[in-house]
Each structure stands twice: as structure tokens, then as C-alpha cells.
Amino acid sequence: YQAYDRPAFLPVDPEAVRVRVSLSKQRVYVTEGDHMLLVMPVSVGGAATPTPSGHFTIVRKQERRRDHSQGYAYRGNRVKQCLIENRPPGWSFKGAPLPYWCEFKPGYGFHTGWVKHHPCTQGSVRMHENLAPKFFRLVKVGTPVEISYSQPEDANHRMPLPPDAGPLPDYPETMYLGDDYFSRHMTPAYQ
């Protein structure tokens, strides 16, 4: 899983970059006009927490963001995943890391996370840890984002998928408390 990567190209005109998300194929297409800059598999929202469809723009970018409500309660050596309102009395709370956050709607964004072969997020778009830094560099605040059930590019872009992260063991919960998870990303290389 950690070795998975996809080629990416830098744009000639960053103002012409566009992002299209296919919910049915769980794919992101980053384009500059007719030129494909990056095609990547992602995980999108599940049935109960769907990724919103529509036309958006990137409104905020933050390389090291933490969630405000979901995360980890900890006390001494004990750590457990929870919502902030469910943390045990007397325990501290640290929001879940959301590296390479690119927000397109309040509370929704692209970020690093486990990419699974089925819709499974809380509505955001999860990117593979090796592809998130590439995406982050390609988009800017103001980049248009179109999210729909399908995209025209779906018919033309087949790609090998990373192994399904579903059955993989998660990292130790303590990794999410510090900065270790933010440091897992490869330095992006472009064609």
C-alpha cells in the first residue's frame, strides 16, 4: 500500500487547473484544459454521509490540519478514538490529523487518509498519502471543483488501484497524537 504512486505533471498555467470528482468511480481528475495532470483513486462519502455533489472552489488549504470534532482521547498511555463530546471525563483530546487539507465547502475537503475500494468517508475526499502532496501543489485557493456521480473522463482512464486499505492494520493510535502522521508523505515528483 505504501509504495503506491501515480504520475503527475505541473501545469503551464495554474489558473487553468480544474478538479473533477467521480463519485461512482471514486476518482479525481486534475486537468489543465485538455491535458491530464493527475488521475488518482480516492475514497468518497458513504451512504449515510455522502460527499456533496455540485460546483465548488478550493476555499482553504492547510498542510497540517486537525479535525475539530473527531479524534483521539488520551490519558497517560491510554488512547481511544472518539468524538470530542464522547471523551471520558478527565481525558485530553487531539483532533484526527487531516494532512494536505484542501477545503471546497465548509467541513468538506480533500485530505490524506486510507483509500478503500468502497465509499466510506464522512463526506470528505480521502487521498492516498503519496498522492496528497501532489494534489496539494497542483491546486490553489480558487481552483474550481466539480463533483458528480460520473465524469466524462471515467471512460478513458483505467488505472491500477492501491491495495484496499480496508483489511490493512491501522497505524498505532499514538501516531495520530503527534506529528508522525504528517511526516509519512513522500516528496512529490512530477513528470
Regions found by a protein language model. Give the residues of each.
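Cell wall/extracellular polymer interaction/catalysis modules
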Residues: 1-76, 80-91, 182
